[in-house]
Amino acid sequence: MEYKSNQHRQMAKVKNILSQIFFPKRLESYSHESYSGSCGAHAQWSLNPENGELRITGTGPLYDFFGEKEVPWESHLNHIRKVVAHGITYIGFQTFSYCKSLSSVQLPDTLTGIGQHAFAYCKSLPSVLLPEGVKHIKDYAFAHCYHLQELTLPTTLKSIGKAAFCSCHGLN
């Protein structure tokens, strides 16, 4: 009985706090979606919803996104048209996979590796220029990029993982 009484008091406090939030009269909509945040220990992202440009800045590797760790721009996957990255060293597991509208990627010269499935199913991506310094491309990194027609590999490349470019029908 004591538990329910405490629970009711807590709910009353929450209702009181929420009743003190005032929104401007001209506010037409409110979204809980995020357009910026963290994507690595020292890396941040921001998305311009107007033009679909996703900017990644910072240093070091991006997170690997699997299991409990979801891609922070998950709700915007279909709207991302361009990725511009600065300062990062590694693109993690599934970082940009399923960005079906992605048509342009600018990767930094600090990049040394591309993780598994990093760009998998980016069906609109026509070309990729991997900068000098990239040493490793992991399994399925660009798998199912059906429109990928142009790929420039760096001289620093040491390994290409299994099926890294499978179902990239535009590559000869």
Q: Regions from the language model: what does each represent?
A:
Residues 8, 21-22, 52-60, 77-90, ...:
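Structural signature of tandem-repeat unit edges
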